[in-house]
From Swiss-Prot:
Binds 1 zinc ion per subunit. The lineage of its organism: Bacteria, Pseudomonadati, Pseudomonadota, Gammaproteobacteria, Enterobacterales. Pfam families: Anticodon_1 (PF08264), tRNA-synt_1 (PF00133), zf-FPG_IleRS (PF06827). GO terms for cellular component: cytosol. It comes from Shigella boydii serotype 4 (strain Sb227). One of its GO terms (biological process) is isoleucyl-tRNA aminoacylation. This is Isoleucine--tRNA ligase. Its cofactor is Zn(2+). A motif ('KMSKS' region) lies at residues 602-606.
């Protein structure tokens, strides 16, 4: 028997079947670095329209976690897809390098500044620590396949950036947005510093809930207000609070002007309460026998005075909109030094902003004899005992409630009035302008707009000063007596900024005021405060984007971060940009959800459900991680687990196998010589290229909309359904058995070439390593890297006016599906082995029959059977299978007649008819020794 294997065009490629990504990717990365791939892309894209995604700086502390990976991969997908869409899209990664977490790490190792090290040495240690953290994180980000200017990232601790942060503050001062005030701010007693809103988390805490009576100073005036004469015992206004420790700072009692307040007689005294809360208060304090003596509107009680239970002074009743009937008594204990609402109303009434608490959370000397030096959280019991002793405590109970805590220490924080610097939301219209700017930004998903609008509408002034060592100095001089800013503040700040640009922030602390103030130095003091780190990162639109040459003066198009950044980086950037320039720093803002485990639980080391990106890359490869990110809807929580990653690896294999099939069957194809013109191609091949064209339209639209899970779904559908289960299956016969250089085969290879050129580009933003690998095996002259090019423009499709148009092939797909069902049943019944052992008769209604007949003898190639005939629907025998999908089709199957050709495996009756090739069929003889078969349709 002759060996005809050598006459077949069997697939062949060096592109490996297995990805082995974990082993192969590092080598590719090394090549990208050695070649300076990022630089090559920049050179290729020079002069094109720009798209700038400005990197929100991660904090330079600790290893990267799965959330970091999601963030950087999403950014990289966008930057690469924009490059393929014809944009110059430079990506400059950055790091946030100042602030408390780094100080704490350095403190743990070396002690606090001033103990073993000077503050200057401490800052140097912080700078050193941040630099090592940046290096560690950078390696992991690069390993993810993220392309960017990793050799020249921006760091908020770069001297030039530090100088520009000072300049940003100068512009804000110049525009009139800064003010100073003793104002209650979130204060962590462990950090001994004010905290930004974004540094506050809420946890459940148990506190004492107390009802306290403040006795009226003028009892008769109150009787007159309520129009009563007989009252048994003293009259008191009752407040309710869960922070007894703040009572020493009480300076008023707030009531609502429009609520009805009742004078209620209880045993031996009368109490004033909001009328709607009388019943619940009586239940709480355990009183069943009470009488309402009279009611008045809250407004009637304004400025009546009540005696503080133990501080020895009296306080006024004042009117406030913040009073509610949700809980309590309808009268709110008001301590302007310990709460933002209290502060605002205190300003209105000219109350003292008293703060009897030191930075360490203990009462200052002279507060009250039994409280001086006591930690405020240990003082609650002392205050309760004091109230009991004075007969002012009506009720106490334990209550669990949500309480603000320090994000770093997880310990409860306090509101504490301290002298701080603020960016005012309203004194120069910053709030109104910011709300206007928000409307001009595209928020993705669109609910982000309402979220940030409500935050801006309701936020307090931004406290930008911190009492820290490792941070950008505010660089201000204030007058010793008046505490006013120096009249030449902007000039002086520029002078400081120039020095910082040369020597870093230490230049401020080393600066002798005389050097720039001359004789005035004795009248002014240097402000020791540093800037909130959110000011550092929030000013990068100015300190980085406006100054980096690759951005060439273009504003950022996009900011992309996790959904917690509405109150973090998106907010601080909006505030600073609007305060400086009157406009938002971004055109689009995209947010992604947090990662959760397969059961939807938050990632937590204590539960042990974290997924380490390093482990995933070492086991499965970065492309699997990238595919998981792209295939997950980032607008909600993003679930990840070993099982979910395994599914991503399965999807990856399907895409890789498709790419490998294309490459293997392009063996021996030179596009410069072997390409067949579209009009001369086999119709099915043109249909396949048309499928790729339709897929490309969908995929590009999805990339444009940042809808990456749609990109992956469409890519999978193309690979698995349109190619894998239909086209690639059908063409194997023609591809392997036709004459190597025949139009029948070259037409097929032309289609595969166009499809491969398109597919490799669709993959590139997501499966960057694999796309680079595929690119290296594609035939024809090309640039060295897929990333320097643009989407493939060589695709074409069938015209709707053609008889065998897309709709024709869609129907053929359905027919083939119905035939497959019949073949599967016959295999199950052991009537046939493979589909080529079958011959089918398609009994069809006239319209469908005409379409099927048009394919002539080539119908069998579409159906993968050895025989296929078309007959009238009404002639179908009883055992013909009625199609459920196509009502006008029945399918009958019989065993194919003739012998099996060992070369093409088809069963035909002409095997052995040619003496010289006695073992093969006539079609194979033609392909081996003759002119080769002609194919027109399939």
């Amino acid at each position: 028997m002759s060996d005809y294997k050598s006459t077949l065009n069997l697939p062949e490629t060096g592109f490996p079947m297995r990805g082995d990504l974990a082993k192969r990717e590092p080598g590719m990365l090394a090549r990208w670095t050695d070649d300076d791939l990022y630089g090559i892309i920049r050179a290729a894209k020079k002069g094109k329209k720009t798209f700038i995604l400005h990197d929100g700086p991660p904090y330079a502390n600790g290893s990267i976690h799965i959330g970091h990976s999601v963030n950087k991969i999403l950014k990289d997908i966008i930057v690469k897809s924009k490059g393929l869409s014809g944009y110059d899209s430079p990506y400059v990664p950055g790091w946030d390098c100042h602030g408390l977490p780094i100080e704490l790490k350095v403190e743990q190792e070396y002690g606090k500044p001033g103990e073993k090290f000077t503050a200057a040495e401490f800052r140097a240690k912080c700078r050193e620590y941040a630099a090592t953290q940046v290096d560690g994180q950078r390696k992991d980000f690069i390993r993810l396949g993220v392309l960017g200017d990793w050799s020249h990232p921006y760091l908020t601790m770069d001297f030039k950036t530090e100088a520009n942060i000072i300049r940003a503050l100068g512009k804000i001062i110049g525009n009139g947005h800064l003010h100073k005030g003793a104002k209650p701010v979130h204060w962590c007693v462990d950090c001994r510093s004010a905290l930004a809103e974004a540094e506050v988390e809420y946890y459940d805490k148990t506190s004492p809930s107390i009802d306290v009576a403040f006795q009226a100073v003028d009892q008769d005036a109150l009787k007159a207000k309520f129009a009563v004469s007989n009252v048994n015992g003293p009259i008191s206004l009752v407040i309710w609070t869960t922070t007894p420790w703040t009572l020493p700072a009480n300076r008023a009692i707030s009531i609502a002007p429009d609520f009805d307040y009742a004078l209620v007689q209880i045993d031996g005294q009368a109490v004033i309460l909001a009328k709607d809360l009388v019943e619940s208060v009586m239940q709480r304090i355990g009183v069943t026998d009470y009488t309402i003596l009279g009611t008045v509107k809250g407004a009637e009680l304004e400025l009546l005075r009540f005696t503080h239970p133990f501080m020895g002074f009296d306080v006024p009743a004042i009117l406030g909109d913040h009073v509610t009937l949700d809980a309590g008594t309808g009268a709110v204990h008001t301590a302007p030094g310990h709460g933002p609402d209290d502060y605002v109303i205190g300003q209105k009434y000219g109350l003292e902003t008293a703060n009897p608490v030191g930075p360490d959370g203990t009462y200052l000397p002279g507060t009250y004899p039994t409280l001086d030096g006591v930690n405020v959280f240990k003082a609650n019991d002392i205050v309760v005992a004091l109230l009991q002793e004075k007969g002012a405590l009506l009720h106490v109970e334990k209550m669990q409630h949500s309480y603000p805590c320090c994000w770093r220490h997880k310990t409860p924080i306090i509101f504490r009035a301290t002298p701080q610097w603020f960016v005012s939301m309203d004194q120069k219209g910053l709030r109104a302008q910011s709300l206007k700017e928000i409307k001009g930004v595209q928020w993705i998903p669109d609910w982000g707009q309402a979220r940030i609008e409500s935050m801006v509408a309701n936020r307090p002034d931004w406290c930008i000063s911190r009492q820290r060592t490792w941070g950008v100095p505010m660089s201000l001089f204030v007058h010793k007596d008046t505490e006013e800013l120096h009249p030449r503040t902007l000039e002086l700040m520029e002078e400081v900024a120039k020095r910082v640009e040369v020597d870093g922030i230490q230049a401020w602390w080393d600066l002798d005021a005389k050097e720039i103030l001359g004789d005035e130095a004795d009248q002014y003091v240097k402000v020791p405060d540093t800037l909130d780190v959110w000011f550092d990162s929030g000013s990068t639109h100015f300190s980085v984007v406006d100054v980096r040459p690759e951005f060439a003066g273009h504003a950022a198009d996009m900011y992309l971060e996790g959904s917690d950044q509405h109150r973090g980086w998106f907010m601080s950037s909006l505030m600073i940009s609007t305060a400086m320039k009157g406009k938002a720093p971004y055109r689009q803002v995209l947010t992604h959800g947090f990662t959760v485990d397969g059961q939807g639980r938050k990632m937590s080391k204590s539960i042990g459900n974290t997924v380490s990106p390093q482990d995933v890359m070492n086991k499965l490869g970065a492309d699997i991680l990238r595919l998981w990110v792209a295939s997950t809807d980032y607008t909600g929580e993003m679930a990840v687990s070993d099982e979910i990653l395994k599914r991503a690896a399965d999807s990856y294999r399907r895409i890789r196998n498709t790419a490998r099939f294309l490459l293997a069957n392009l063996n021996g194809f030179d596009p410069a010589k072997d390409m067949v013109k579209p009009e001369e191609m086999v119709v099915l091949d043109r249909w396949a290229v048309g499928c790729a064209k339709a897929a490309q339209e969908d995929i590009l639209k999805a990339y444009e909309a940042y809808d990456f899970h749609e990109v992956v779904q469409r890519l999978m559908r193309f690979c698995s359904v349109e190619m894998g289960s239909f086209y690639l299956d059908i063409i194997k016969d023609r591809q392997y058995t036709a004459k190597a250089d025949s139009v029948a085969r070259r037409s097929c290879q032309t289609a595969l070439y166009h499809i491969a050129e398109a597919l490799v580009r669709w993959m590139a933003p997501i499966l960057s390593f694999t796309a680079d690998e595929v690119w290296g095996y594609l035939p024809g002259e090309r640039e060295k890297y897929v990333f320097t090019g643009e989407w493939y423009e060589g695709l074409f499709g069938l015209a709707d006016s053609e008889a065998m148009n897309d709709a024709f092939w869609d129907e053929l797909l359905k027919v083939r599906g119905e035939v497959n069902k019949v073949i599967e049943q016959a295999r199950a019944d052991k009537k046939v082995g493979g589909s080529l052992e079958a011959a089918v008769t398609l009994y069809a209604e006239p319209e469908l029959a005409a379409k099927l007949t048009a394919l002539g003898d080539e119908l069998r190639f579409v159906l993968l059977t050895s025989g296929a005939t078309v007959a009238d629907y009404h002639d179908a025998p009883a055992d013909a299978q009625q199609s459920e999908v196509l009502k006008g089709l029945k399918v009958a199957l019989s065993k194919a007649e003739g012998e099996k050709c060992p070369r093409c495996w088809h069963y035909t009756q002409d095997v052995g008819k040619v003496a010289e090739h006695a073992e093969i069929c006539g079609r194979c003889v033609s392909n081996v020794a003759g002119d080769g078969e002609k194919r027109k349709f399939a």
